Each structure stands twice: as structure tokens, then as C-alpha cells.
Amino acid sequence: MSKNNSTVIKMDEQVLKYKEDLYEKTVHHLKVTIPKKIAEYQELAKSYGQNSENEQDGQTSKKRKLDSEDYVLMPIEDLIKTNRVIMETHQKFKKAYIELIETFSVIRGWISLNIPRIEDGNNFGVDVQEDIITQITKLEEVYTSLLDGSESYFASRASLVKKILKHKDIEAYRYSLAQVDEKEFTRFSFSYFDLANNYATTYSLIVKNFAKLETPRPTNASNIY
Amino acid sequence: MSKNNSTVIKMDEQVLKYKEDLYEKTVHHLKVTIPKKIAEYQELAKSYGQNSENEQDGQTSKKRKLDSEDYVLMPIEDLIKTNRVIMETHQKFKKAYIELIETFSVIRGWISLNIPRIEDGNNFGVDVQEDIITQITKLEEVYTSLLDGSESYFASRASLVKKILKHKDIEAYRYSLAQVDEKEFTRFSFSYFDLANNYATTYSLIVKNFAKLETPRPTNASNIY
Amino acid sequence: MSKNNSTVIKMDEQVLKYKEDLYEKTVHHLKVTIPKKIAEYQELAKSYGQNSENEQDGQTSKKRKLDSEDYVLMPIEDLIKTNRVIMETHQKFKKAYIELIETFSVIRGWISLNIPRIEDGNNFGVDVQEDIITQITKLEEVYTSLLDGSESYFASRASLVKKILKHKDIEAYRYSLAQVDEKEFTRFSFSYFDLANNYATTYSLIVKNFAKLETPRPTNASNIY
Amino acid sequence: MSKNNSTVIKMDEQVLKYKEDLYEKTVHHLKVTIPKKIAEYQELAKSYGQNSENEQDGQTSKKRKLDSEDYVLMPIEDLIKTNRVIMETHQKFKKAYIELIETFSVIRGWISLNIPRIEDGNNFGVDVQEDIITQITKLEEVYTSLLDGSESYFASRASLVKKILKHKDIEAYRYSLAQVDEKEFTRFSFSYFDLANNYATTYSLIVKNFAKLETPRPTNASNIY
Amino acid sequence: MSKNNSTVIKMDEQVLKYKEDLYEKTVHHLKVTIPKKIAEYQELAKSYGQNSENEQDGQTSKKRKLDSEDYVLMPIEDLIKTNRVIMETHQKFKKAYIELIETFSVIRGWISLNIPRIEDGNNFGVDVQEDIITQITKLEEVYTSLLDGSESYFASRASLVKKILKHKDIEAYRYSLAQVDEKEFTRFSFSYFDLANNYATTYSLIVKNFAKLETPRPTNASNIY
Amino acid sequence: MSKNNSTVIKMDEQVLKYKEDLYEKTVHHLKVTIPKKIAEYQELAKSYGQNSENEQDGQTSKKRKLDSEDYVLMPIEDLIKTNRVIMETHQKFKKAYIELIETFSVIRGWISLNIPRIEDGNNFGVDVQEDIITQITKLEEVYTSLLDGSESYFASRASLVKKILKHKDIEAYRYSLAQVDEKEFTRFSFSYFDLANNYATTYSLIVKNFAKLETPRPTNASNIY
Amino acid sequence: MSKNNSTVIKMDEQVLKYKEDLYEKTVHHLKVTIPKKIAEYQELAKSYGQNSENEQDGQTSKKRKLDSEDYVLMPIEDLIKTNRVIMETHQKFKKAYIELIETFSVIRGWISLNIPRIEDGNNFGVDVQEDIITQITKLEEVYTSLLDGSESYFASRASLVKKILKHKDIEAYRYSLAQVDEKEFTRFSFSYFDLANNYATTYSLIVKNFAKLETPRPTNASNIY
């Protein structure tokens, strides 16, 4: 501190405007974007589940998921081609994951800017804010790491294809490749349900505690700027 | 919070409908799906155990599990073929694991959406909800990682077969391959018992505490939406 | 919870029958299987110890354990053969380990199903149940990882044999192989004592606390179904 | 301590001047630099988001982000060229990250030098200082590690290009390269929002608690030199 | 628990006999085996120390430990031979380590079987039992991992000899080999002292607290069976 | 303790003299060395910052930092030459880091020797001593690991140059090398500020608490020897 | 415990004699060995520091430490020769480290054997004993791991020399080798100071608390045997 007097630093108008902008986006997300997303993914989870069942009972022509046996009998030129269905589904899910991260990072941004001055008590509301920021940050980290899913899928596929080409007589490499592709379909079958579930659980946490997020210390509102 | 007034955000009807849908599925799972699964896996554990005993006493013709010695004497072309029994049993267990994950993630979803607003006390019911969500999440993680079992089995088998082909005179690689296959049979012999046991233990935890899961704070039901 | 009334979910008869079946097996294990195992392994530990001593004093013809020097002088064709005694002993111990895991996982299963509803106090009995479940789970994990022992033994042996064949003049690889085999014999010499000791210690813990395992909350038995 | 008398050591004038210099820079950053940065990155986040949307609807000629398919069809000489847009955007972000680190390390330096003598109580203000130093240090560590982003991007790109050149028929390597580049664009799309958000959250924390940072122990100012 | 009555399970006579057998061995170890071992290793530590000093002053003809320089000048055929002294000393120490493990695992076994029923208080004696079991387990783990010492010594020696043969002009590999052998001699010089010290410290802990190990809960002896 | 009487052991005069010598060096460092260093590095940070700005605006002839593009166009013989400026700056910083470690390890040595006898209370002063020893030890560890910086820089540079020579057509390796060199200049730009900041923060901590470091327990000075 | 009576086990006379022997060595170390070592290393630190300064100002003929440039210009046959000064200094330090470990492990041994029976209170003295045993164990671990220093130095040197021979045109490998050697000289320059400092700090801790180490529970000496 300067030797003679202490300096008064106030929240800059531009920053308050930035916070207000995040607040409006937050309200829009809670009233419109998120409920719509939950309904959308609930439907997609149902229809995706239905498709897999039809496929297992042979009702659909276009088989997305091959059986392990197919991988052993398939000529090598087909084997090393990338499965179009897997690639397209990856792109769809990446868009969905980016949307989720963008939506909740706005809400996290607003809550962080709404944390009042550190005080030696009366912190229940601040604990709620910090608890919810932690939950949202965890959610964003899960979906950020899921974004790397396709890179690691292609890397494993490429290295197995390399081994298949090098050791044409070792059947187990082909089965291993079958498992790598099958795992993607298994993950897809959970992904829509998980998206609906994660949106809903985090939405429910925020909505039920919105009053505390807005006014962490009810008595003296002034300290929140 | 907007400078002048605070916004009221209510749980969206679509989300409440989503929660109701999860609730009905949860009740169905507790009354029908899970008890049926426990009985099914209890039987499979008994019959699987019986088969292994008959096989050891040479009563069954079709030997699923070869002895180590077989692996040393077997011609290389047979050695490098994948064991059909192991592959089929993998596929059966993967289906069972996916079913378990789907069943309990629905229940976890409902419980999460039933967690009331964060309050500074009267949280015994919420602690029960969070404790059971943690147990279910752990169960789902165990079975999600078990889904990778077949990929790592084929990868180890392939790399050992490669070494056997390259070092035909090193007996120990063949014994190592025998252990890799034998370990799968040992795992299968535990898997049905573990499935019955895990379904039953988690079911017992949920059923005995269902009242608290439904109504974590008895006095004022309104705060659960 | 459904908006109008709360649902009563009771423990399904099939699950209670499953629990009863585990209970009867538990009593049988405590009264018959385990005491018999402890005596059996106590004897095997003594006789195994006796054999090693006779062998060191050269009394027995068939030397199971070779000295390091033998490994340096031995022709390479013999060196790369797997030691029959080690393989047979592995198979014996694997059977013993599987039996131990099966025996205690049944007891663990029964105790888990006997954990009463979560309550905010009067939990001393439940703590005893959870403490003993933790001890049994640790024991099962130790013996499950010991099951992998033979696979890693053969993998180390194979890779050393490969180096010996490649670098015939490097004596130290042959000594290293001698150590790998010798370590198996050292482990065997402890294994029977450890089996007796682990069975006895876990048995003693369960038997001394059996009343609490059966009736964790003495006053009101109804809550255990 | 010297056997006879204790030595009085006072804060050197040069060090007090150094602290005063950091203090003035801190005030300038809080009043000018940081609010300007928040507004700047808020704008960049909006305009960057807008560009990506236009690009996806094909409105802009210069496509920064290629689709996976482009990577499979592209001739190898183009494939192995580094994407100019990615490189330029890296350089821009590195400048922004260095600025952020320089800005907040000055503020951290001032706060550290303003921590008073260790006392056995009356430490609420010191806890606020230490808490904020921890937050700033975390922020600096995040952006220091982000500085390594471009080195690891080029290393992954180089090693994938090497594999593509070596295994021209393995399509999956090309898709893997597409993911590596696409990931950079996804990171860029978050980076401006994160910069605005991190500046604002840390700024809000410092400004709201500036009084405590300046005068951690209100009663006796003398102990802060 | 069976729906109608609770079962009484008592400690099986065979198990009590097993415990009694461990008890007698424990008393013998404390009165005879261990004091003798401490004296023996105290002597060996002194005489080993004396030999090293004589060797450094050149008094002994047979130099066990070569200087680094010897390794550079030595012809390659001698260099790649394993140092007889190191091998023989390894075998001696392995015998000593196995003895230590066998001795204390018997004592640990007895103490474990003497742990009374879990009670909600009056546990000071039980804490002493568990503390001493932890100390003995740590000691067994240290000496079990030391048993692997010779395997890793030969593995490092073999891989360095391989490099020396491949890069005859790189002096530093020969110095590295000198360090690997020298390190064994340094370890040997500590090993006898450590054996005496570990035996004595653990013995002192057990003897001083023997009353508590025998009778953890003085008042009612019946609960220990 | 010897069976009959207890031995009195006093601090040896040579050790007290050693402590006095450390004390005098400590006072000299706090009054002279450190303030001078803080001022010196504050200046160097400013001038280093100024140079980089001039360079970016092209005012200086001798460009220390090349742009990524230079690395792609540069002939390979120049590319594989080590950047003189980076090497010289490394040597300068290593000297500065060694000085910092020597300066503060003397102060840490004195404080450690001034820790009084362990007592069951009245330990506030001792806690201050131990807290400051921990801070200084952390500082020394940071700068000891920074000393390894140049070894790892040359190792990364060498391995990238090797790849560039092997894969002349893979541009990304050249960009990767550009990043490795650029990272050193970025680190240099922070290093002088960090040196000033770390000296100042640790100095301020020691000076403000010097009375407690000298006399941790005011009442009875005798126990500090 | 045997079913009828409890056994009295007393500390064996040989063990008490062993403890007395450690006690006498401890007193000798505290009165003679350690103070002498502190003075010796204090001197060596000063003279080593003096030599480095003279060398930097070119006063001494025999340059122990070469500059990085020397490594680039030096013919390869000289480069691959091991630096005699580094090797001799390693041997000197190894002797010093072994002495330190032997000295303090004797003291640790005595303290451990002087720990009284575990009691439910009155444990301040025992806490002091355990705290000091922990400090001495940490010191022994630091110097045991430093003993491996020369092995890892020669391993790094050998692998860099291999790379220099393989890639004669990559200058950076020669600079990397210069850093590896320079790091040893930097470590040497700290080692004597650290030896003096570690001896002194541990000595000061033991001497100031010697009364508690000897008589942890003043009231009743009998329980210490």
C-alpha cells in the first residue's frame, strides 16, 4: 500500500456490463436452451436405442455395427477403410459437446462474477456458489476430454490396421479391431442418455438454488456490485 | 443479478416430465428387472460352476478350457486361432454389462433430479441420496471398464502370438498364452456370481432406503418440485 | 417421486431367497470349509518346509530348485525348457486361490445384503459389517492379483530366454533367469503359510463378530427384511 | 543469534521502492489494463464465434477449418504443409497469454510483499491475501502450460505426417491428422471466451477484496512497513 | 440372518490348536531365535566392517571390491564374468531375509488371531496389537522386496555388459558397470547392521508390549477364545 | 541410556562457532546482498523487456529471436547450429540461480541451528522458524530444478534436429524446433522478474519475522545454546 | 495366549548389551565424530568455493571445469574420455555419504531401542523420540539415494557419447554433454556445504533433546529396561 493513503478501486463499468451480458445469457439458457436440449437428447436416446434393437433383430437393412466374425472374413481393403457411420456420429457428438461446454461456461462465468467479497462468516450462499461452480467445471472437463475421443479412436484404429497389414495371419489383431469399433457404438448408445442426464442434473442443481446464486448474502446486497 | 430486480426461474415442465419418466422406469426396475436379473445370474453362476467341475472330471466332451500342456503340443496353426468359447462368452458378458449400466444409470438419473435445494441443515436424507449416487456411479465405472476387457484380451493374445511365431523354440511364450486364455475362463467363473452379487447388494441398498430417496426432507415436500 | 403419492417398494421374495442361500453357505463355510482349509494348509506349509530342508541337505533325489551355478553350466536346450515343478505348483496354488476367493465372496455377499437401512445413529453394528466387508474385499483383491502371478512369471522367463539365445556370452542373463525361477520357489515356500494365516485371521475376525454381522441393530430386527 | 545482543534488521529502502513500483503498476492494471482486456476478448469471442457460424453455412470464401473428408482426398504434398491459420492464431494467443501472466504476476508480487509479520491471530486479512495469491498462481500456471500448446501441436502433427508418409494406404492416419488440426480450432473457439472469463473472475476477486489486500490488519498499520 | 433364529458360531478346535502352535513358536522366537540372530548379525557387521578396512589398506590378498580403474583396464572376457563374491553374498543375505520373514510372520499370525471382538471402546490394547502388526508387516514388506535385489542386479549387469560389448570405445559404460558392482558391496556393508538393528527394534517393541499383545482387554479374558 | 547414570551432552564449541559464522553471513545477506540483487534484477527485467519491444518493432539490428517462418526457410546447416544468444543467456541465469541457492541455504542453515529444544507448548516462534525454513527449501528446490533447464533444452533440440535431418520434407519438425527455441526466450523474459520477485518475497518474509527467528521463545534464552 | 497362564518375556541380556554398545557409540559420535565432521566440511566448503573462484579468474592451471565451447571444439577421442576430476570427487563424496549414514544409523538404532512400552498418555518424550527417528531416517534416505548419483551420471554420459558418435554433425548433443558434466561440478559446489549443514542441523536437534531421548518418561525409569 502506498505509504500515505489507501486507493479506492471500483468495479469498472465495462466489466459490470460484461457481467450483465452473461446474466442475460444465463437466464435464456435456463428458460429456453437447456430444457430444449434435455427433451431433444431424451428423444435421441430413445430412437438410438430402438435402432440398435431393430438392427439386432435384423429388421434394418443398413447394418451400422458389424459382428466380430465379419472382421475376420472381410477382405483387407474393406477392413482398413474407416467406418463412415462412426465418423459421422463422432462429428454429431462433438458439436453437441461443444454446445454443452459453451452453454454451461457462460453460466459458470456469471456465477463467478457474482461471488461477493470474502467475509469471515455468513458464507452459506457463497458455499452454494462455489459448490455449483465446482460441479459445472467438472462437467466441462468431462466433455472437453470427450472431445479428444475421436483422435484417440483414429490413432488406435490406425495402429491396429498397421499390425493387421504386417501380420496377416494373426487373427487376434482383427478381433481387436472389431472391439475398437464396437466400443465406439457402445459409447454412442450411452452418449445421448448421458447428455440428457447431465444437462438435467446440472440444470436441476442451478434452478433449485438460483436464489442463492443471485443473492448469496441476502441482508446487504450492496457488496455484490 | 440484474441491477434492479431478481428473476424467478422455475423447473421447466419438459424437465419435470423427463424426471417422471425416469421415476417410472426406476420403479419398474426395482419391482421387475432387477429381481429377475438376480435370479437369472444366480442360476447361471450355479450352472457355469457345475460345467467347470464336470469338465475337470472329464465328463463333458467339449473341453472349453485347454491345459497348459495342450498349448505346448498344439500345432502353431491351431495355437494362433482365437478360442471360439472365449469370444462368445465375451459377447454374452458385454451384453449383460451394458444392461446393468443402463438399468442403474436410469435410477441414478432419477435420484440426482430428486436432490432438493442445498440447505444449511436437515440434510440427512440428501446425504443418503448422495451416498447411493456414489455407490451406483462406482458400480457403473467398474462395469464400463470391464467392457474394455475383450479389447485388452485380444491385444495381449495378438502380441503373444506374434512372439510365438517369431521365437518358435521359446516354450515359455506358449505357456504365457495358455495363462492369458486360462485367465479369461477364471474371470468368467467369477463373473456370473459377481453380477448376481452386485445387482443384489445395490438393489438392497436402494430398496431399504427408498423412502429417503423419494422424500429426503419429509417436512416440506414443496422444495423438491 | 410421482407428484401425488409415494411408492412402497419391498424386498422381492427371490432376492430374500438369494440372501438366505448365501447365509446357509456362509454358515457351512465357517463350520466346515474354512477350519478344514486352515488345517490342510498348516500341514502343507510344514511338509513343504521339510522338503526344502531335506533338499538343501541333499537328502532328496529329485531336486526341484537348481542352484545359480547349474544355470550357467546347463546346455541351452535344457535352460529354455520350463521347470515342470514350477508349472505344476502354479496350477495347485491357482486352484487354492480361486477356492479362497469363492469362499469369502459368498460371505461378503451375505454381509452386504444384511446391511440395514442407513440411519443417523446406532451404527456401531453397521460399522463392524462395513469394516469386515473391507477386510474381505482386500483379501480377495490380494488373491485375485496373485492369480496373475504365473502369467507374469512366464512372460519374464520368455523374455530372458530370448536374451540368453541372443547374447550367449553374457553370463549375467543366465544368473538373472536363475533368480526368476528361484523367486518362484521362495514364493511357494511362503504361500502355504500365508494361505493358512489369511484364512485363520479372516475367519477369526468373522467368527468373533458374527453376532454383530447377523444383527447389526439389536433393538428393531424388522428393518433388516 | 549472536551470543550477546539481537540485531535489528529493517526493510531496505530499495526494496520498499520496488514494492511501491509494483503497487503503482497494480493500480494501473486494475483501473486500465484489465477492464480493457476483458472488453477486447469479449468482442473477439463474439466475432470468432460469428466467423465459425458463417463458415459452417459456407458464407466465407477462406475456409480456415477443413472437414475430415478433405484430409482423405487431399494430395500428400498439401497434407504435410502446416495450416497457416493455425500457426498465426497460435502466435496471437501466445502474445495474449504472456500479457496475462505479466499482468497478474505484478499484482501477485505486490500482494506477497504486503503480507505482514506472522502473528498468532487476527489473520483474516492475511488469509484473504494468501487465498488470492493462490488463485493468481493457479491462473499463471494454467496459461504458462498453455504456452507449450503449439510445441506439442507441431510435435503431434510431425509424427502423424511421418506415419502418413510411411503408410500411405492407412486412411485412419489421415483422419487422425484431421482431428489434431480440428482440435486446435475447437480450442481457439473457447480461448477468447476463457481469456475474458479468467480476466474478469480474477479481477472481480481482487477488486472486491482490495481493501483487505492493502490493509490486512486494520488496527496497526505499522507492521506492514 | 435366517428369518427365525440366529446361529451360534464358535471358534473351531482345529483353529484354536493352530493359534496355540503359533503362540508356542512366538515364545520360542522371542526367547531364543531372535536374541541369537541379533548377536550373530552384530558380529557379522563388525567383522564385515573390519574386512573392508583391511582391504582398503591393502592388507588382504583377495580383493573382493575392484576400483573403477580396474574396470577400464580389465580385458572384456573378465569384465563380463559375474563377480563370485557378489553372488555368494547375495545367496547368504537371501537366506537371512527369508529367515527374518518366516520368524516375524509367525508372530504376526499369532497377534492377529489374538485380536478380540470389535467393541465400541476399551480398545487401547487392540490399538497396540494393530500398531505392532503394522510395524511387522512393514518389516516383512521391506525384506520381501530386498529378495528381488539379486534379480535386478543381474538384469542391470547383463544390460550394461551388452552395451559394453556393442560400444567398446565408450569408457563410461565400463565405469557405469563398476558403479553397479560397487553399489552391491556398499549395500552389503549396511545389510548386517540393518538386520541386527531391525531384529532388535522390532523385538524390543514386541517384548515391551507383550502383556498387551497377550491380553488386550484385561477385564474379561473370555472374549479372546 | 546406560543402566546407572544419564550423560550430559553439550553443544560443541566448534558447532557454536559454525552457527555464529552462518549468523554473520545471514545478517550480511539481509543488509547487503539481497537488497542489491533485488534492485539489479528489477533493472534487468526492465531492460530485457525494453529490448524485446525494440526487437519486435525492428529497431535493433541483432535479432535474438527468429520467427517460425525463418526456421522453415533457413538452410539446414544453419538450422542445426545452436543459438549463441540462448546459450550465453543460459550461462548467465545459471550463475544467478546458484547465487540465490547459496544465499538462502546459508540463512536456512542458521535458522535450523537456532531451533530450540522441542517443548510441549509455547511453540509459536518455532512454528514461524519451521514455516520460513519450508518456504526457503521450496525456493531452493525450484531454482535447483531450473538449473537442469539447459540440459533438457539441448536434449530436446538435439532430438528434433535429428528428426529434421531424417525427415527433410516434414515442415512441422522445423516449426517444432522454432517453438523449442522461442520457449527459451519466453522463459528468459519472465526469469529476471521472477528472480526479483522471489528474492523480494522471501526477503520480506524473513525481515518482518527476524525477531522470532532470532528468539523463538522470548522468556528463557538459555535453551537456545 | 496359552489357555491357562500368561508368559513373562524379558529383554534378553544379549540385546541389552547390544543396546549399551549402540549407546556408547552414540555418545562418542555426539562428542567427537560429528563436531569434527562439521568443522571438516565447513573448511572443505570454503576451500572448494575458493578454488572455483580462482579457476573462473584463470588463476589455477589445472582447469577442472571445461566451458561448453570446449566441448564443441574438442576432438571426439578426448570428448568420450571420462573426466578424471569428476570421478575422483565422486569417490570422495561416496565415502563421506557412507560415513554419514553409518554414524546416524547407529544413533537411530539406539533411540529406537530406547522407546518405552506403548502407553495411553504421558507420551511427549516418546513423540520427541519418534520425531527425531523420522528426521534421521529422512537424512539417511537422502544420502542413500545420493550414493546412486555416480551410476546415473555415467549412464547419462555413456548414452550421450553414443549419440555424439552416431550423429557427429548435431552440435546440440555436445552441448548436452557439457551440461551433464557441468551439473556434477555444480552439485559438488553445494555438497560440502550441505554435508556441514545436515550434520549440524541433525546434531543440534539430537543434542538439544538428548535428555528426552535418554529418559522419555521421567517418572518411572523401570519401563525402559
UniProtKB/Swiss-Prot annotation, chains A, B, C, D, E, F, G:
GO CC terms, sorted: cytoplasm; nucleoplasm; nucleus; proteasome activator complex; protein-containing complex
UniProt keyword Zinc present: no
UniProt keyword annotations, A-Z: Nucleus, Proteasome
Pfam family, one: PA28_C
Compartment annotation: Nucleus
Name of the protein described by the UniProt record: Proteasome activator 28
Any one Gene Ontology molecular-function term assigned to this protein's record: endopeptidase activator activity
Organism: Dictyostelium discoideum
One of the GO biological process terms: regulation of G1/S transition of mitotic cell cycle
Membership in a protein family: Belongs to the PA28 family.
Main location class: nucleus
InterPro entries per the UniProt record, alphabetical: PA28_C, PA28_C_sf, Proteasome_activ_PA28, Proteasome_activ_sf
UniProt function note: Subunit of the 11S REG (also called PA28) proteasome regulator, a doughnut-shaped homoheptamer which associates with the proteasome. 11S REG-gamma activates preferentially the trypsin-like catalytic subunit of the proteasome. May also be involved in cell cycle regulation.
